[in-house]
UniProtKB/Swiss-Prot annotation:
Gene Ontology, cellular component aspect: cytoplasm; ribonucleoprotein complex; ribosome
Name under which the protein is recorded: Small ribosomal subunit protein bS6
Origin: domain of life: Bacteria
An annotated GO BP: translation
Species the sequence originates in: Bacteroides thetaiotaomicron (strain ATCC 29148 / DSM 2079 / JCM 5827 / CCUG 10774 / NCTC 10582 / VPI-5482 / E50)
Annotated keywords: Ribonucleoprotein, Ribosomal protein, RNA-binding, rRNA-binding
InterPro entries associated with the record: Ribosomal_bS6 (IPR000529), Ribosomal_bS6_sf (IPR035980), Ribosomal_S6_plastid/chlpt (IPR020814), Transl_elong_EF1B/ribsomal_bS6 (IPR014717)
Annotated GO MF terms: small ribosomal subunit rRNA binding; structural constituent of ribosome
Chain's gene name: rpsF
Amino acid sequence: MNQYETVFILTPVLSDVQMKEAVEKFKGILQAEGAEIINEENWGLKKLAYPIQKKSTGFYQLVEFNADPTVIDKLELNFRRDERVIRFLTFKMDKYAAEYAAKRRSVKSNKKED
């Protein structure tokens, strides 16, 4: 199993309930394929660097997970088919990126405890 990180942008016309529903759909796809979700972050509504599909903002979502490489094809196919997703990027984390992400998560959890 490899460690991956996926960032996807949902269309800004969604309500909070619809946004959470879309995120749960993709997490469900990962879990159904045997992936282990490590971390999930909602970055909220952010301005895009350039307009995509005539939209200048979008809901950013990050998911870190461990999975087999075959799972990525199924996940990205579902991203392409879903009209709510306007962009996505999945990449395999090397050992340094995985260590950095773990360190970042631990610092973030320490800040929440304070």
